[in-house]
Amino acid sequence: MMMTKQKNTLADRLNIGGEVRELRLGATFNPKNSSTAFHTIKYDFKPASVDPNRMAAVDVGSNNQVTVTVPNLENSGVPHTVYKGNQRKYAKECLMIYDKETGAITLEKLNHNIQVKKTRSEMTHHKPSFLPATNINHNNIPMSTNGSGPGPGPGPGSGPSPPLSGSASGSGQKLENSTMRISSKTKVSTGSRRNNIIDFKPRNSPMQQSSPSRPVASHRSPQSAPAWNANNAQQTLPSIPMIMDDDDFGLGAALHNGTGGGQANISGSSTGSSTGQPDYGGGGSSSSSTMHRQRQVPQHGQHGKRQQMHQNHQQHPSPPMHQQQQQQQQQQHYGRGINNGGGSNNYAQQQQPQQHHQQQEQQRPSSSSTYSHHSNNMPMDLDFPRENDLTSQTMAQAGAAIEEQIGGVLSASSSSSESDSSDSDSGSESDDSTDDESRPMQQQQLPNLGLGSISPSYNNHQQLQQQPPQQQQQQQQQQQYNHHMQQQHQPQQQHHHHHQQQQQQQQQSDMYTSNRGFPNDLLQNDLQLSSNSSDDDDD
């Protein structure tokens, strides 16, 4: 099929037809012929810019090297296209030539087979300018390329030809560009590496700790830790003397208290010291205070902060309205304790005179210890001399009025005590039962007054200390006289209620004196009640 197809195409192309024609041999078959030769050239690529109307030049050099220069179109921008290759001889290859005018067919013998490839040297028209550039580039190649050999030079040819020079210049230009790119890349790469090492190291890079260029950071890290520990040690030092002061004060207060449950409370309850009531749980308070100190030992910082907050609270005292409310609350608490547990006071009056004397002796050093406690822990109250002067004046006036009232009450009660003292003996059994109930209520009421009532309670305590000793002696004499009269007479149940009211009124008057006195209306009411009770006793 292939042969028939080729034959068909050949007959069609030549328009020979089916006729038999004569075949002639050409001059190449003549051995004496030396002027005519036929060669074949095979191109790998033929661009569209080649001009078919112009003749090409073939240059055959030594070692069968052939250079073919084909002209291009004028508008292509490149004047020539250069091909290079080699040649070899044909052994039994022929060429048939058909003449269209005469119709003759001639057979010629082929001499050489030439195969060429296109070279990329289109800038041949700048030959004079590029020749010295090529020499300079060849001289600079070993310097710029770090030991790399020069590029491949042009192949050997038969003399200087324009296509050859153009190709050499084109290769030189390529080498120049390549070496410039390589050198620029190496410079940029080395520069970027140095910048990475120098510039980015201080900016939190992972090489900052392991790099040998910064050994200072590694040496500074062990020195910073002891400095921090030293600072912490200095911060914990100020809390040690405060704990030692508390311990020393606790021991001093314990020595002042003795073995009997006195009035001084180490935990700082100012209400117990201001009211003058005995502390039935003195041993328990001292043990609780020691346990409280043991709990405070591992918390130095918190203890210091709490003291600072407490001092700030003391430096900013509450307004007068707040103090008045606190005083009213204290009066209500004491009124409840008297109404609910009045038997405790009767129980205290029914004790022997020796026990009263011992308790009073214990109250005096304990009150001094509580006063020292307040003076040590509360420097803020000493900053108000005006209030102290006013309270001292009011206490002096109230003391004088109370002495006159107590004298009248004693004269009125002396006539009725003979008939009324027996009633207290009959009610002593009931009072003993209520005494046990009044003690826990007093213990519950005392801790309810916190740090908010320290300043008024401290003033009340100072007022108690400023009372005249004559008033205290009169109260002691009254208690001893009542106790002596109670043991001598028989019980009478008719006037027992009036006698309890009289005792409660006396206790309330004592409580009001401890709280900066009481109004004149209450004094008049007490005098009227006492006079009424004396009239009832006479009836």
From Swiss-Prot:
Residues 267-278, 309-337, 345-375, 461-493, 520-533 have a biased composition (Low complexity). It comes from the Eukaryota. One of its GO terms (cellular component) is nucleoplasm. It is found in: Nucleus. Its main location: nucleus. Keywords: Activator, Developmental protein, Nucleus, Phosphoprotein, Transcription, Transcription regulation. The modification Phosphoserine is found at residue 205. GO terms for molecular function: transcription elongation factor activity. Residues 151-163 have a biased composition (Pro residues). Residues 132-146, 174-195, 220-238 have a biased composition (Polar residues). Residues 420-435 have a biased composition (Acidic residues). GO terms for biological process: cellular response to heat; positive regulation of DNA-templated transcription; transcription elongation by RNA polymerase II. InterPro entries: EAF_fam, Tscrpt_elong_fac_Eaf_N. Residues 119-539 are annotated as: Disordered. Belongs to the EAF family. Promotes transcriptional elongation by Su(Tpl)/ELL. Essential for development. This is Ell-associated factor Eaf. It comes from Drosophila willistoni. The lineage of its organism: Eukaryota, Metazoa, Ecdysozoa, Arthropoda, Hexapoda.
